[in-house]
């Protein structure tokens, strides 16, 4: 069973030119994945500065959308990403590191979409639980004694932002 949520955000606006997408070429360290699954993510200053540099470079290149890989962002950084999205009018889509709640290891995708509400810049933060976990990912989660969530129904968000559709 599949559930598709269609979200329309600033559909009255259009891109002046073709939208520009920045894909971060960054290393996802196994040590960061493991510490995150244990509930102690790496929130060091150097790591934060690496993300800040990638975002700044993408903005300078004129990106409208910034993509990061799976397991790359601690959820504690999401509020900073949302502020950046709001200020720079850049959508950010990233795979969050595992989020441990009780005995379950969750894997979320976050989509941060800039909006203007009554003349004020803001950002909408959308979390979606990953539907399908890789075999090795399940082994890591179970190896630490946690359960792997199985969403039912599978959920997908179809986002229409400024008349650009993506999921």
Q: Where do the PLM segments sit?
A:
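Proline-rich intrinsically disordered, low-complexity coils
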Residues: 19, 41, 74, 114, ...
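Cys-nucleophile CN-hydrolase/nitrilase-fold catalytic domain and related Cys-dependent amidase chemistry
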Residues: 45-128
